[in-house]
Amino acid sequence: MTDGHHFNNISLGGRGGNNPGQFKLYSGGLAWKRQGGGKTIEVEKSDITSVTWMAIPRSYQLGVSTKEGLFYRFFGFREQDISSLTNFMEKNMRITPEEKQLSVGGHNWGGIEINGNMLSFNVGSKEAFEVSLADVAQTQMQGKTDVVLEFHVDDTTGGNEKDSLMDLSFHVPTSNTQFPGDENRPSAQVLWQAILNKADVGSSEEAVVTFDGIAILTPRGRYSVELHLSFLRLQGQANDFKIQYSSILRLFVLPKSNNPHTFVVITLDPPIRKGQTLYPHIVIQFETEAVVQRDLTLSDEVLAEKYKDRLENSYQGLIHEVFSKVLRGLSGAKVTRPSTFRSCQDGYAVKSSLKAEDGLLYPLEKGFFFLPKPPTLILHEEIEYVEFERHGAGGASISSHYFDLLVKLKNDQEHLFRNIQRNEYHNLFNFISGKHLKILNLGEAQGRAGGVTAVLQSTDDDAVDPHLERIRNQTGDDESDEEDEDFVADKDDSGSPTDDSGEEGSDASLSGGEKEKSSKKEASSSKAPLKKRKPKGGDAAEGSEKRKPKKKKDPNAPKRAIAPFMYFSKAERANLKNSNPELATTEIAKKLGERWQKMTAEEKQPYVEQSQVDKKRYAEESAAYRGAAAMDVDSGPASD
């Protein structure tokens, strides 16, 4: 939006706490998006009824009222932003903002103003506070002069706040002139009736529709799902969640492939909380072929006035369709269904693994969704690039019948979807290419010699893994050939060293220094005549090679010099582990190798200098060690 203004760190006010995000004002309206993804608010210019400025502690607040009766509060603006934004709105949007003042005197008497779904308490001409009537769960009179408002207490709003507003009481004298009454209908009752007309009250007594015994995978359990006018409730044996519809971002209806179940996912912002665990997605599993009939407990007047063209009196059909239609009508949330993608078995998803969990990866029109656990939604706009890889966890070579898909986000977060079947490759590659997402190894993915496609098309499970070879070339090898051969020959040991491994073992797997080419050639030529085939009829399989006994290492020998990459690894391993605690040791080693390869010569120079000092130390200790060994040989006969 080049014709407008763009601000970072602008917060959206509400009962859910202060959510920072990006604010954009342009000639066609305004937009706000939560930082890190999530809730998005867009208001067209034609829907705006009024705009107000207010000075609040440490910043300025921009208030926006809409034709639907909604009121948005954005704060975090500076004093110098007021004039520029005011001029822009007057010139390009034909809107003149009104300045309001905040009452800070501490008076608890004043007047009440109801504008749309907002209730403001004013002291004179200044505003003391305001509340949204959409957050009111119940309102009732106490005596003849008091009106009490009770607010929703759900499991989403205020999740990060220590305190939350529970109730609010107004005393309305019988002599009040703002809400005039009489002997039979006092002023407090007039105010109560005005609030009652704007708030969704009474909805907590009776649910509009109920679905019993529903299997929910996240948070796991069987729940009775009640849909009310302004919120839904999940009642289980051990848990009870209450969620306002304003917290629902979107609904997903995703059938399983070759399975009699369908996922219905409710995406929330803010998420619900269970202990210290946050659940941004509620994953419900319905039986695909189950048919139900439900009547809504709504009067014809309410349906006609509030839910016209959104709800019907009764529904009959597949249970997941009935549930999603009623929830969409009550909450106003949009529904996302499978995209044009089809797997090799004509399904909507491909089988894969994320972390330690098996599940389904759904390629959607605007993102990817992995279900059921952990439910992970990745939007296309958040993706930096994708990369096709043919290797298992930590780079271990596996069968060419599978490949991995790495998704790198713009915030440097990565998601690795493992063990996708080879026959899904072309459909997935064509879909990603059609969405114009950046493919990092595009040349390899398109079938270049030695690339992913070439390897996947090979039926030889022992084919060379180009990604694994690239990692090996990056990390180098500073150990002797004898130990390398023993390591490779052990088929059961295919992992990388752990954090507790010795430094010499780590050098063999992770070092990126120079190779001792001449010594390796000599060792290779000397070992060639020693390789013999196992005679037929032996215990091992035909063609197997007898393992050579490992040469005993002198404990007094000097420790080999550490390569520059190892110094870099030691310096960055802890930081990488702290920022990505879910990564396995082998994955950390891989990421360190990738970072090292992308570094410039200047960035590598400090580690190169450390390695050169260590090489000098190794050369000196080696010379002293060889001299001591020669003395031992010379003195050997005398000792005999």
From Swiss-Prot:
The keyword DNA-binding applies. InterPro entries: HMG_box_dom (IPR009071), HMG_box_dom_sf (IPR036910), PH-like_dom_sf (IPR011993), RTT106/SPT16-like_middle_dom (IPR013719), RTT106/SSRP1_HistChap/FACT (IPR050454), SSRP1-like_PH1 (IPR048993), SSRP1/POB3 (IPR000969), SSRP1/POB3_N (IPR035417). Residues 476-487 have a biased composition (Acidic residues). SMART domains: HMG, Rtt106. Residues 513-524, 536-546 have a biased composition (Basic and acidic residues). GO terms for biological process: DNA repair; DNA replication. Residues 558-626 bind DNA. GO terms for cellular component: FACT complex. GO terms for molecular function: DNA binding; histone binding; nucleosome binding. Signal peptide: none annotated. Keywords: Chromosome, DNA damage, DNA repair, DNA replication, DNA-binding, Nucleus, Transcription, Transcription regulation. It holds the Pfam family HMG_box. The keyword Transcription applies. Its main location: nucleus. Residues 457-562 are annotated as: Disordered. It comes from the Eukaryota. It is found in: Nucleus; Chromosome. Component of the FACT complex, a general chromatin factor that acts to reorganize nucleosomes. The FACT complex is involved in multiple processes that require DNA as a template such as mRNA elongation, DNA replication and DNA repair. During transcription elongation the FACT complex acts as a histone chaperone that both destabilizes and restores nucleosomal structure. Belongs to the SSRP1 family. Component of the FACT complex, a stable heterodimer of SPT16 and SSRP1. PANTHER family: FACT COMPLEX SUBUNIT SSRP1, FACT COMPLEX SUBUNIT SSRP1-B. This is FACT complex subunit SSRP1-B. It comes from Oryza sativa subsp. japonica (Rice). The gene is SSRP1-B.
